[in-house]
């Protein structure tokens, strides 16, 4: 387990944290079967998307998750989100290969492609959506995988791009 310090204070620091996170995964890639990242919800989609472009050639899962309610609150969504994110990251096919081989966001029973996810609500448990790409999986009693939607890289090995620019404007 690695912790990246306190909450981000500014957009300038976010780029550095993305670099740190990408570097930690890159340096530990061969030691683990997958990665689950607990993240605040306000910037989770941005971080997950950035990592999906910074780390190319993934053959292992990187699953982002978090919660709308703090983990200590009895009705928190965080426990289910964390447990299912771990289950998704550990899931393998009949050949023992990870089912998920990309960066994704898991939230409230839904698995989204990271660079197609967006936070859509600060007040509902269904806080994320993917208006431009369908779900990768849906969790219920079983996890229902939509295999035809899962990304498979053609790159032979993991490649990392650690440089990011802070000169980007987010316009809504």
Task: Go through each PLM region and give its residues.
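Short coil/turn connectors at secondary-structure junctions
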Residues: 30-34, 57-61, 98-102, 108, ...
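Short Gly/Thr/Asp-enriched flexible loops that form oxyanion-binding sites at enzyme active sites
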Residues: 37-60
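Short, structured patches in soluble enzyme cores that scaffold and shape functional sites
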Residues: 66, 105-109, 140, 147
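Short, glycine-/small-residue-rich phosphate/pyrophosphate-handling segment
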Residues: 71-117
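Accessory alpha-helical/coil subdomains and C-terminal extensions
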Residues: 113-172
